[in-house]
């Protein structure tokens, strides 16, 4: 999708995953989206649209379609992992990444040899950026709803300009700042509301 449309379009449409989970989560998981969930989804998508406003384009229908399919696949993966909340989702993640490796093997064989720095970067990406983050994701999905596991990571692309600013002093646009603030605020308020709701439902220390 990133080769057939803009990066902004691809990222925004991939994060349509919360919509698919809100629609299908009730059927497959029994987790029905609440009014607060839909409000959060609308705020997040609105904020991300504003965040990427400078780069969004209406063309590139094929690339945009592939990005939507990517979001649907992300939602499907999350629902499948949440379905295993009482067992161990890690095995499914390992098998999925092994399958991805097998599919990508023909391109690896024909690629130029990696330098030492390339192998170091590949190792870090495999163990930290993917391995450790997937391990955390598998643990988190046991304790939160499928919708929450895709809403909270939305802050990841929003924080990218912050790291760029710290590393290169490149300032994000006003649209990016405004959109990012909306997304972070919506996700934070949703998380606080969820914590309070679960705290109110939890039995007290003297409950029998």
Regions found by a protein language model. Give the residues of each.
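Helix-loop interface residues and adjacent transmembrane-helix termini in multi-pass membrane transporters
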Residues: 4, 30-32, 86-87, 143, ...
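Hydrophobic core positions of alpha-helical segments in small-molecule transporters
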Residues: 13-14, 36-39, 62, 69, ...
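Hydrophobic transmembrane alpha-helices of multi-pass small-molecule transport proteins
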Residues: 23-24, 33-53, 70-74, 97-104, ...
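C-terminal-most transmembrane helix of multi-pass membrane proteins
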Residues: 53, 154-208
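C-terminal transmembrane-helix exit sites in multi-pass transporters
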Residues: 17-39, 158-178
